[in-house]
């Protein structure tokens, strides 16, 4: 069964969503992060909550640690955190604060030796966020090119004990237009590491189609704020 991970994106301790990762598209969500935690926690089908420090991702250093630590106390659900995590000490601080999983992006992509070290130190608790326009990987809050191909890069990770690869199609993110099923399915076939789909998910039909592609989990952004998404779920 595919897992459901609703997302909370933070700017200035406020729950927001971006479109295509563009910071000037910031949209404040109707629920605060605290309200979102309470809302998502009522659903048995929610396996964990996905929290991103958006300014941390852009600034290359975690900015919302204390606030995220306070959110951790509000739920018994697992929580994963990403955004600006670049050092082992940051990872250890999050784990000490009760965070279950850490997501690394730019640092892990630019330094695979470090990624391997972190994954072996914390097996199954480190997730790699791979964000791409088409097959072109982006870093530093989606603002910089890498000249890395999505599939070539992912194939190099096969011996690293990651919890999973979080794949976001930037062109789909925040648009509620459906995930990139084609590339997501190809990515699942290209690696033995669990693939988590993010970006564009609208409704349960999208979830079912991702499940048919053997996607491990789906991160739900804007759609998770709509009661209609959760109808029929417990």
Curated annotation (Swiss-Prot):
Main location: cytoplasm
EC numbers: 5.3.1.16
Any one Gene Ontology molecular-function term assigned to this protein's record: 1-(5-phosphoribosyl)-5-[(5-phosphoribosylamino)methylideneamino]imidazole-4-carboxamide isomerase activity
Catalyzed reaction equations: 1-(5-phospho-beta-D-ribosyl)-5-[(5-phospho-beta-D-ribosylamino)methylideneamino]imidazole-4-carboxamide = 5-[(5-phospho-1-deoxy-D-ribulos-1-ylimino)methylamino]-1-(5-phospho-beta-D-ribosyl)imidazole-4-carboxamide
Any Gene Ontology biological process: L-tryptophan biosynthetic process
InterPro entries: Aldolase_TIM, His_biosynth, HisA_bact_arch, Isoase_HisA-like, Isoase_HisA-like_bact, RibuloseP-bd_barrel
Active site residues according to the UniProt entry: 9, 131
One Pfam assignment: His_biosynth
UniProt keyword Metal-binding, yes or no: no
UniProt KW keywords: Amino-acid biosynthesis, Cytoplasm, Histidine biosynthesis, Isomerase
GO cellular component terms, semicolon-separated: cytoplasm
Subcellular location(s) of the protein: Cytoplasm
The keyword Amino-acid biosynthesis appears for this protein: yes
Pathway: Amino-acid biosynthesis; L-histidine biosynthesis; L-histidine from 5-phospho-alpha-D-ribose 1-diphosphate: step 4/9
Domain of life: Bacteria
Recorded family membership: Belongs to the HisA/HisF family.
PANTHER family cross-referenced by the UniProt entry: 1-(5-PHOSPHORIBOSYL)-5-[(5-PHOSPHORIBOSYLAMINO)METHYLIDENEAMINO] IMIDAZOLE-4-CARBOXAMIDE ISOMERASE (PTHR43090:SF2)
Protein name listed in UniProt: 1-(5-phosphoribosyl)-5-[(5-phosphoribosylamino)methylideneamino] imidazole-4-carboxamide isomerase
Gene symbol of the encoding locus: hisA
């Amino acid at each position: 069964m595919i897992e459901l991970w609703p997302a909370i994106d933070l700017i200035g301790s406020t729950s927001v969503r971006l479109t295509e990762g563009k910071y000037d598209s910031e949209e404040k969500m109707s629920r605060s992060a605290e309200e979102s935690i309470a809302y998502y926690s009522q659903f048995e089908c929610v396996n964990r909550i996905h929290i991103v420090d958006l300014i941390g991702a852009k600034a290359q250093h975690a900015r919302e640690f204390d606030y995220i630590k306070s959110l951790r106390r509000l739920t018994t659900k697992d929580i994963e955190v990403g955004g600006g995590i670049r050092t082992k000490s940051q990872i250890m601080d999050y784990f000490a604060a009760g965070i279950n999983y850490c997501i690394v992006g730019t640092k892990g992509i630019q330094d695979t030796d470090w990624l391997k070290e972190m994954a072996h130190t914390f097996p199954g608790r480190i997730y790699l966020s791979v964000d791409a326009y088409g097959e072109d990987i982006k870093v530093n809050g989606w603002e910089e090119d890498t000249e890395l191909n999505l599939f070539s890069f992912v194939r190099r990770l096969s011996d690293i004990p990651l919890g999973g690869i979080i794949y976001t199609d930037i062109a789909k993110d925040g648009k509620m237009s459906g995930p990139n099923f084609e590339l997501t399915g190809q990515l699942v076939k290209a690696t033995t590491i669990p693939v988590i789909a993010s970006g564009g998910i609208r409704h349960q039909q999208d979830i079912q189609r991702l499940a048919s592609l053997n996607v491990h989990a789906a991160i739900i952004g804007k759609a998770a704020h709509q009661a209609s998404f959760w109808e029929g779920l417990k």
